[in-house]
């Protein structure tokens, strides 16, 4: 009986401490981190609204925002040049342009972003960057138990991609689903639309340029969109970066995924280590991409969904909301991959 009493007292104390941390004004910075991290993941924002009022959540969102880039993308700035070069602008340029012997498709770099381990992949030919999609979308009316979602490691094997990262968001009540958020465009056709409203579309045109556009799926296709998904925010447009409202750097800290393109057409996949509450902030991600020559860039789904696969191996360590490792990566619905062109593959194997 005494043991039970002590256990109940311990539970009561723990609950009291949790409420103290969640609501006491002296822990406001930690509370801000909890809210901004939950909102940032886009699929776990219910956590913020469970513990805090809409007014409190909105207060944090407003403080953590950065001003959107007021630029219409100009793809004429992108002049694709896939030939090897031996002159460099700086050390970052040299790191990208110095190709690994025997690998004309991509280069993998292990770097730091905001003090966190990170992975950068430079893909030399943007025509080899294709949208990855899971086996099926919306296989059941119960969004929590859709069976069509797929881990990036399995997507890459099934679709023949040597490199793959996760992409857009999806409906998630804690169990995941196979229902994408927003639009999905594949081979110039809308294969999924959550609604008919304009969204932040991230994709590649028929001439293999990264197009960042606020539009409906059909509007994007009219502008030459080949493959696209919906997510955001846009991080760099025409070399212009956002202005931040506070010193936090926007969107708090978390594991990050971003896609970018340099003016020479080289595509960058950036994936960082972290959790839902630890990892680079958005400014640190942007600064890193700028260093490596990104001219246009966008944020992709981070947190637990964060995945980079190279040659069938998961390169990062995805962690769930509790900080535990997610073996093999989380099941998602979209991503971006390097699928080698058959002609180039034939040339390099002769």
What does each model-found stretch correspond to?
Residues 163-167, 212-213, 237, 296-300:
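General beta-strand structural signal in soluble alpha/beta enzymes
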Residues 175-195, 244-296, 300, 305-350:
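Conserved, well-ordered active-site substructure
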Residues 135-140, 216-220, 272-276:
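Short, solvent-exposed aromatic-acidic interface loops
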Residues 170-246:
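Active-site-adjacent helix-turn-beta-strand microarchitecture at beta-sheet edges
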Residues 116-118, 147, 158-160, 197-199, ...:
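Extracytoplasmic
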Residues 127, 208-210, 265, 304:
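Structural signal for glycine-centered tight turns and loop->strand junctions in beta-sheet-rich domains
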Residues 2-193:
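Zymogen propeptides
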Residues 118-122, 201, 234, 258, ...:
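Conserved hydrophobic/aromatic beta-strand scaffold that supports enzyme active sites
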């Amino acid at each position: 009986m005494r043991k039970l009493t002590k256990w109940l007292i311990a539970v009561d104390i723990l609950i009291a401490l949790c409420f103290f941390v969640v609501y006491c004004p002296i822990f406001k910075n930690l509370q801000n981190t909890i809210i901004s991290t939950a909102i940032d993941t886009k699929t776990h924002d219910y956590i913020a609204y469970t513990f805090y009022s809409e007014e409190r959540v909105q207060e944090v969102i407003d403080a953590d925002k950065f001003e959107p880039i007021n630029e219409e993308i100009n793809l004429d700035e992108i002049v694709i040049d896939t030939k090897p070069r031996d002159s460099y602008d700086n050390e970052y340029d040299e790191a990208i342009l110095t190709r690994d012997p025997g690998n004309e498709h991509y280069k993998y770099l292990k770097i730091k972003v905001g003090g966190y381990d990170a992975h950068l992949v430079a893909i030399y030919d943007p025509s080899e960057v294709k949208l990855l999609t899971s086996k099926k979308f919306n296989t059941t009316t119960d969004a929590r138990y859709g069976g069509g979602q797929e881990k990036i490691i399995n997507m890459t094997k099934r679709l023949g991609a040597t490199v793959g990262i996760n992409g857009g968001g999806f409906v998630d009540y804690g169990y995941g689903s196979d229902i994408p958020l927003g639009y999905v465009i594949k081979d110039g056709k809308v294969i999924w639309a959550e609604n008919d409203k304009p969204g932040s579309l991230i994709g590649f045109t028929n001439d293999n340029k990264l197009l960042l556009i606020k539009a409906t799926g059909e509007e994007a296709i009219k502008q030459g969109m080949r493959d696209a998904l919906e997510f955001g925010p846009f991080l760099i447009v025409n070399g212009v970066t956002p202005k931040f409202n506070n010193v936090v750097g926007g969107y708090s800290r978390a594991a990050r995924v971003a896609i970018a393109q340099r003016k020479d057409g080289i595509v960058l996949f950036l994936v960082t280590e972290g959790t839902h509450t630890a990892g680079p902030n958005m400014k640190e991600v942007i600064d890193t991409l700028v260093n490596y020559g990104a001219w246009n860039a966008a944020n992709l789904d981070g947190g637990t969904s964060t995945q980079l696969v190279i040659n069938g191996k998961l390169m990062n360590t995805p962690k769930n909301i509790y900080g535990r490792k997610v073996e093999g990566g989380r099941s998602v619905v979209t991503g971006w991959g390097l699928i080698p062109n058959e002609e180039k593959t034939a040339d390099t194997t002769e």
